[in-house]
Amino acid sequence: MKTILEICREVADLAAVKRPNDLFNSYSQQDSVFLSVAKSSLDSMLRYGNWQELTKGAFFCTVEGKKQYPIDEIVPDFYCLLNNTVFVKDTHERIIGAITPEQWAREKCFHCAGSEIKFKIQNGRFVFLEEPPCSVKIVFQYRSNNIVWDFNTFEEKNVLSANTDVPIFDEYLVKLDILWRWLKRNGMDYSEEYNEFQRELKKKFGAELATRDICLAGSGIVNEGVTANEVKICFKE
């Protein structure tokens, strides 16, 4: 488990330049460049895809009289939802899928009263078509926006703020990424280093996809009165 400063020092060795002493020393242009490149690297890896390290689960329960639920109020480290991982669990723990845009438009025009709960994701919010019953449990998976660990407390953070911060991502990937970015920033040829990084990135990301969570949002009937992707709930009297 290497800190961001240790990784940058290894990059400096590979680039045959002076090692940085303090990434947050604003009086050292060399150190400032390493910090800028490290931040760019971590931000880029966050945006690349749904890493297992960033995948988290969460839930909330509906409240009487409330139709909209901002996601960042449920999970402060929210970056984006994972596709096909939002489900409704009723009091009998039945699992069903979220409403599609086509279903939403149809229901807005031709809605008939019934025992159905339907919602969509809009502007970072869960928006229900009709006011849902109280205490309906919505579960979902999302990508966290955290990029580093605090070395002392192991707390996840979404900002690189200390020399001792530890990247959440694979340290070898981070080193390769910082290396080619540093070379590019300094006007040097970086094609070989960039290609090596891309190969390792795809290899690592592909391995993580092989162990990702199983999606339960299949099509078809999964239980009597519960239709996957049609968001139908039949409550027992």
Locate predicted features.
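Glycine-enriched, solvent-exposed interface loops adjoining structured elements
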Residues: 1-237
